[in-house]
Amino acid sequence: MALNNEFEPIDATQHDIKKFRCGKPTMDEFLHRYAAKNAKLGLSKTWVLADRQPETDKAAIAAYYTLSLLSIAPEQLNNGNGLPRYPAPTTLLAQLAVASSYQGKGLGTASLLAALMQAVKTSDNGLPTYAVVLDVLDESAMAFYQQFAFFKPLDASGKRLFVPMSVLKKQFDVA
């Protein structure tokens, strides 16, 4: 195994996209059919953790995450935070998955932290956003995200979570 230390933008010519399997069909399908296409269209950007093998042309994908932009209506956010009364820009953590053969090795946490750091970098150096938002797929995903105390429910269902950029900057000690 020659697992990269860092995530890199998805590239269908370099990464074996079609062989990725994580045990969640919707997550597999997104990577197989939409990740590279959506990146080309400017709809989202997917980063992968590649596992390069000398005997193969394309690197296996150990994990991936996808970020996009999302506007949140002001009534969904706490009125006491000084935000204006129009939709707030946020970063959507749209996808996060670890290939089945790499699960149980800490890559879920590593992927989440990489995604959150990328969101902070993008917010600081490109397009400012108020928070990171994510939609929880199922109960196992909820258990995973609940390990990170900084995520808070954004809606009554509790399945849409968010964390303000200001909290992430403190968490990662970013000025």
Where are these regions (language model features)?
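Non-catalytic substrate-recognition and accessory regions of acyl/acetyltransferase enzymes
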Residues: 1-105, 109-175
